[in-house]
């Protein structure tokens, strides 16, 4: 039972970190997610959620750096690529974001990532991001 329990600790830290994020307890979330990342360096999930904590605070440049660091190790993680695009949209970098979103949709590797990318792309097209305006081509 000891080894089986120990193997679950990183997953539990990720879940607790995500829960703290949803509750707005961002410092607690970051501490839990960093612990999970240290125990599971091969898993992009804790660091992707870490980027979400920065995004939640409006620290879009820090979220971007965090997502890019994840993608340096996990280049095809389309969910992280979608969150990166969201951080670019928040920084009004429409062209970069739209290209990234389209690449996620075109790759079609991860259903949740594709749905998120399509939703963000549709919002850009409808001009829901201030200053983005509808696409002209």
Where are the language model's segments positioned?
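Alpha-helical segment of the N-proximal tetratricopeptide repeat
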Residues: 7-35
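Start-of-helix register in tetratricopeptide repeats
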Residues: 11, 45, 79, 112-116
